[in-house]
Amino acid sequence: MNESYQPTLIEQLAQEYWEENETFEVKEDLSREKFYCLSMLPYPSGDLHMGHVRNYTIGDVIARYQIHKGRNVLQPMGWDAFGLPAENAAIQRELPPAEWTRKNIKKMRKQLKQLGFAYDWSREITTCDSTYYRWEQWLFLQLYKKGLAYKKNAIVNWDPVDQTVLANEQIVDGRGWRSGAVVERREISQWFLKITDYSEELLKDLDELKEWPEQVITMQRNWIGQSQGVIINFNLEKGPDKLQVYTTRPDTLMGVTYLAIAPEHPLAKERAKKSKKIAAFLKKCKQTRVAEADIATQEKEGIDSGLFAVHPLSKEKLPIWIANFVLMEYASGVVMAVPAHDERDHEFALKYDLPLKPVIEPADGHDWDYNQAAYTNPGKLINSGSFNDIDSKTAFNVIADYLKNNGAGSRQTHYRLRDWGISRQRYWGTPIPIIYCKTCGTVPVPENQLPVLLPEDIIPTGHGSPLKETASFYKTRCPVCNKPATRETDTMDTFVESSWYYARYSCPDQDKVMLDDRAKYWTPVDQYIGGIEHAVMHLLYARFMHKILRDLGLLNSNEPFIRLLTQGMVLKDGAKMSKSKGNVVTPQSLIKKYGADTVRLFIIFAAPPEQDLEWSDSGVEGAYRFLKKLWGFSYRIKDALLAINQQKERSNYQWEAPEHRQTRQQIHECLQQANIDMERLQFNTVVSAVMKILNILIKLTTDNDAEAHLIREGTGILLRLLSPITPHISHHLWQSLGFGGDILDTPWPRPDPKALQTTELELIVQINGKLRGRIQVPTEASKEIIESTALNQENVQRHLADKKIKKVIVVPKKLINIVV
């Protein structure tokens, strides 16, 4: 053991030890309790950033802690390697995405290993490898057979110059990020997964997720968006057709003054053929972004279709407007507008001089100016004929029943959740295993022809679809009739890859089936760690896919992740670290200067995992100083500990002196609190406990036999508490001080109940119920000793002067009250 702390050397030695001994390679063992710890897999951008390091350090602390607790721990790592960023980088660098991606993976794998994470690298997966995505294609075929994968027209952002579909984030001020062309809304045929078939179960099973953050549960609940409402039929004034409207407010039905339909509604398209004005309006609507949030915040615009519908109750004529705020994807693409009781409808009605008809007044009877604002709260019905004077809640049921009995409507449970559109008109993704034949139609690729390989030598230009221009890919033969046919050139949304990867880690070497029985052993994941930005997309899709895999008999649990931790962001100068802000601190530079353990210690100590972490250079320096202090202390006590650790009776030492028992009590109290905090994932306060223990131990001397044994016990506790957080220095010191071989083979420390037993108690002394002092007495002191000690306390004596004591009441182990 060197006198000075040399992190680069000891970290290299520890990492070599773990690799040579395959320390973190695990096998299934039914005799042991398993623990599956997983951090969200990274996109291989080429460089780890501090957000990565924080995420993975938190996960590693949990995994190593569970190893110490004797569990069979799996902590794997892999790469979410497909997707748009790689395609964009390839366009800029003029090289294939495959080449760029694999180079980045190699670089990032090295960076992760430098941080000493306890990963089972034998299970590494890369989602752009055909050995991975062939099973995704197999899964797609199973969904297709069950009717859970289907194709329909849907609206996308279309760049007319680059002839490609754009993601919302690729649009800047309404224009394509590369071409600068005005983006259009275009309807194209796309593949969907029927997640809506699982809406009810996805919602219900949120109640099972007792160890997920409430915020994530709420976000998913809102995203699924269950509502109880009514489908109402509005017959067109002319002809047999009708419009169906879904509403959660049937109590406002008598206040409908117009209907609004989506620009993509068949009725709107039909009217555009007969009206240039309507055609021009629909063309303008095509230049609106597809995102629901953008549509909600844009200026409300519309045009009168010239058509009328008939109110199902009053039989009044209602004008039908085409409006840019109505979504074709929501319900039936038709809205019943009640401007007196809906803010958006109110805004639109005022703009186009449409009538307002109040049908609900405040329950307390106070006046409301409906021209100024919509009244959106519950109340009492007015201007509603036979429904007048009914309260809103009752009116919901009364009107719903009336509509049902008269064939004009029906109750319906509705979900905001839409089917998952997985088609991407991009190159760098999993090919969808479908063939189109002029004779046989849509034909799934036979399972024995999987995988449909993605050509990896393509250099995308950003114009059009590279796969549509690659004849060697799309030209094929129909597996049914053997005539010339074409492959599907859309690829899958990368969220598909990340929706089942956690299960594949259990059996990445399996080439006969998607998942084998090892997946049933390891899943569900016991602890999942990742950012809250994935609350509704990734986490919802993974929950959906888990239920699919369960229904296919591949898994035997309902949910993929038992416990979820959403770590906070890493901030510098109050803002999230980013290259654009110029506030990035690179992990590599810090590891080189201070070592990985210092980086890990700072990240864990600076803030609780779920809170944002404010970067502090002085905090990093402080972490480094602490590790140097620990090293210096260990070097000083090395010889004494080596000698004690060779003794057979070292663990049965009895401390007799009160001061030594008190010191031992302090150490075990720190340990007791650290164990509570470890279970609560409050790792920053575990570090605080470690620092307290070191400060206690430094004051002791190895020249005194009792204190030397205290140092040995305390150091053994300290190193194990630090082991998950700063594994390299803990590993090295454990061996150098003679505690044994691998620190990970030792059980997690538990406080000694005897050490926690106090020898003295503090009692409150009251006179006539008022606090007058505090006394220290032996734990088992008699009533007489307690009384005597209290009456001799200086402040008590002062308050008793010239007073007559009537009685003394002793409440055991709490207080003594002197009545005068």
Curated annotation (Swiss-Prot):
Which InterPro entries does the protein's record reference?
A: aa-tRNA-synth_I_CS (IPR001412), aa-tRNA-synth_Ia (IPR002300), Leu-tRNA-ligase (IPR002302), Leu_tRNA-synth_edit (IPR025709), M/V/L/I-tRNA-synth_anticd-bd (IPR013155), Methionyl/Leucyl_tRNA_Synth (IPR015413), Rossmann-like_a/b/a_fold (IPR014729), tRNAsynth_Ia_anticodon-bd (IPR009080)
Q: Work out whether the entry's keyword set contains Glycoprotein.
A: no
- Which cysteines pair up through disulfides? They are none
Cite the binding residues for ATP. 579
Please name the PROSITE patterns in this protein's record.
AA_TRNA_LIGASE_I (PS00178)
Q: Name the keywords, alphabetized.
A: Aminoacyl-tRNA synthetase, ATP-binding, Cytoplasm, Ligase, Nucleotide-binding, Protein biosynthesis
Q: Motif ('KMSKS' region) spans which residues?
A: 576-580
Broad class of enzyme this protein falls into: ligase
Q: Does the keyword Nucleotide-binding apply?
A: yes
The reactions it catalyses are: tRNA(Leu) + L-leucine + ATP = L-leucyl-tRNA(Leu) + AMP + diphosphate
- Localization, UniProt: Cytoplasm
Where would I look for the motif 'HIGH' region in this sequence?
42-52
Which Gene3D superfamilies does this entry report, sorted A to Z? 3.10.20.590, HUPs, Isoleucyl-tRNA Synthetase, Domain 1, Valyl/Leucyl/Isoleucyl-tRNA synthetase, editing domain
Q: Give the EC number(s) under which this enzyme is classified.
A: 6.1.1.4
**Family matches, as Pfam families:** Anticodon_1, tRNA-synt_1, tRNA-synt_1_2, tRNA-synt_1g
Q: Name one GO cellular component term.
A: cytosol
Gene Ontology BP annotations = leucyl-tRNA aminoacylation
Q: Which residues cross the membrane?
A: none
Question: Where this protein primarily resides, as one coarse class?
Answer: cytoplasm
Which GO molecular function annotation, any one, does this entry have?
ATP binding
Would you identify the family this protein belongs to, as annotated? Belongs to the class-I aminoacyl-tRNA synthetase family.
PANTHER family associated with the record: LEUCINE--TRNA LIGASE, MITOCHONDRIAL, LEUCYL-TRNA SYNTHETASE
NCBIfam families linked to this entry:
leuS_bact
Provide the protein name.
Answer: Leucine--tRNA ligase
User: What is the taxonomic lineage of the source species?
Assistant: Bacteria, Pseudomonadati, Pseudomonadota, Gammaproteobacteria, Legionellales
Task: Quote the gene name from the UniProt entry.
Answer: leuS
